[in-house]
Amino acid sequence: MMMNLDELADYEIIIDEDILMSLFKRNGTIDLQDIQKMLDSHKLPKEIRNLLKKIMKMENNETRKLKPIALNNHAKMGLYKKGGVFHNALPLLLESTSIAMDKQERQVMFFNRMNLPNRKMIIVSASANKKLYQGYFPDRRIIFHTIHKAEYQGKVIQYSAHTMSRKCIEQIGADTVFDKIEKITGKIPVISFKMANKGDIYFGKTEGFDEYCGKDIAVVGTPHSKPLFYKLLACELGYIKKNVSYTLNCRRVVRNGYDFKIMSFADPDIQNLQLFLIETDLEKAIGRSRVLRKTCTVYVFSNYPCEQAELIQTEYLPEINDEEEMKCEEIGNA
């Protein structure tokens, strides 16, 4: 994807990955105080000032589609010359196609859509989600061919008694959590949240690493994103309806052959988006061991059931007052 997209116009394109995961990462944030500083400087063109004023008037958790304002290099240099008040993230904000207001964190989240060449494309992926591709490419003809998934040569053993969300780990204490896990798995590499400081590979940064190939590893955590991030992507995909409140609650879902409870949205489209992102992050982490073709063991500690996993619901952590865990504690076969 590093080539100029125009150079691909005459080619049939084959992508050996779920390209949506890369496209969904085209997001960022800008602090409200930085937007206000730019407005106070009175150095921005009228069109940009008017847009920033509208953004500052948004309600908390509000999402909005935008018509991008494309800036060429000459226009960007002109803004830079107007003084240091110009924020580096401004061009990305102006070129974004959807935004979300987060007044709790005092920032605006934005998403910048990338349109792929209007050519025949073949995407080969075990995680591709038809509904999401139809949402991202509404004007393209999408044809899905489902093939039987290969069985793992290795094993996935999943301990699902605890949510293992960031909040769960923080409440118990990371040292306590990982000490308890090490007693189960032995001393093996761990992939978890970045905050856990368990190495260079963590949720959101698992692609391109092969150092755990054939090794036993532990995958620790349920990689939820901020609810507002799901709403931002949902806005881009056209799922958001006016005057509807989209909130997380403990809900029973049926997915991938499992019937389980998890903190999720009532709207089926946004729920599908959320669960896709969670399970894809988990599966990518599991895949670092190459368990598909190597006789290794991956231990997963999460309440989100993974495909081909042997589920163990024995408790392994101290009792905590985890509201999510008290509500969402059941997993079964669908």
List PLM regions with ranges.
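ASCE RecA-like P-loop NTPase motor cores
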Residues: 1-334
